[in-house]
Amino acid sequence: MELVVKDVQNVLSVSEIIFARDFNEALIHQVVIAYSASTRQGTRAQKSRAEVSGSGRKPWRQKGTGRARAGSFRSPIWRSGGVTFAAKPQEHSQKVNKKMYRGALKSIFSELIRQKRLIVFENFSLNAPKTKLLVQKLKDINLKNVLIVTNKIDNNLFLASRNLYSVDVKDVHSIDPVSLIAFDHVVITVEAVKRIEEILS
């Protein structure tokens, strides 16, 4: 299988086992949900009636006052009382084994190629960490919402992209299923393609 290298008018031979897989929507969905769940903090916490501060004394006697009976100042129906079914910190991550994760990445890359959303460059870099330069570079190739993948983090590219909400820069070890499908296009260097091929083979 061959991919067109845009900036040098050349072709790059890649493995069909990795970049020509069938689209497995169920697998991708499972991996994306698991990845998204693992990014949740899960740190919210509230105090139940057992944990909130306050006296354990009965507010008033059970009978004879004419008021509704009350047994605790910390009751959830009282102001400054505890919370009913108080939320506690919890772990949301889901287990996904390596074979499934790699299979999902292969399927995503294959679909990006089929949809002509994966654009390969021999070299994609900037002379200085300037957002203006990156905006112009993307304008020249008619791209807006784009993920840029390099073999190693290019500092100039990374700094130039930080102020652009529709552009993200990652190295091959930082890519994830959510980022790959979130952007309209993925710009990737030849070195990055070769490295991904090694990782996923």
Curated annotation (Swiss-Prot):
What GO biological process terms are annotated to this protein in UniProt? translation
Any single GO CC term annotated in Swiss-Prot or TrEMBL for this entry = ribonucleoprotein complex
Alphabetical list of InterPro entries matching this protein: Ribosomal_uL4, Ribosomal_uL4-like, Ribosomal_uL4_dom_sf
Gene3D superfamilies the record matches: 3.40.1370.10
Quote the protein name from its UniProt record.
Answer: Large ribosomal subunit protein uL4
The job of this chain, per UniProt, is described as: One of the primary rRNA binding proteins, this protein initially binds near the 5'-end of the 23S rRNA. It is important during the early stages of 50S assembly. It makes multiple contacts with different domains of the 23S rRNA in the assembled 50S subunit and ribosome.
What the entry lists under SUPFAM superfamilies is as follows:
Ribosomal protein L4
